[in-house]
Amino acid sequence: MKISEEEVRHVAALSKLSFSESETTEFATTLSKIVDMVELLNEVDTTGIAITTTMADKKNIMRADIAEAGVDRKFLFQNVPEKENHFIKVPAILDDGGDA
């Protein structure tokens, strides 16, 4: 299937892109080759072949939603350079502290 330069210009305009004449010609040629390659897939006999929607055999693999004890606070805070009221103190990243 041949993609015309006019079609390339039309899609470029819809996408708010601009191309030179040489780029438009090159895109038309390249896109035509891509479409031709994809159309070759229509010639493949897939009779009796199951439809494949994903290559992954497993779906929705998640751990059980079970509450577990967290890390001991003393252990967590032993390497913290600055802390205040059981919080880790970090440098401000907003000038005024922000509205958060």
UniProtKB/Swiss-Prot annotation:
According to its UniProt record, the EC number is 6.3.5.-
Q: How does it assemble?
A: Heterotrimer of A, B and C subunits.
**Reactions accelerated catalytically:** L-glutamyl-tRNA(Gln) + L-glutamine + ATP + H2O = L-glutaminyl-tRNA(Gln) + L-glutamate + ADP + phosphate + H(+); L-aspartyl-tRNA(Asn) + L-glutamine + ATP + H2O = L-asparaginyl-tRNA(Asn) + L-glutamate + ADP + phosphate + 2 H(+)
Q: Which domain of life is it from?
A: Bacteria
The record's keywords, sorted A to Z, are:
ATP-binding, Ligase, Nucleotide-binding, Protein biosynthesis
Protein name listed in UniProt: Aspartyl/glutamyl-tRNA(Asn/Gln) amidotransferase subunit C
Q: Which family does it belong to?
A: Belongs to the GatC family.
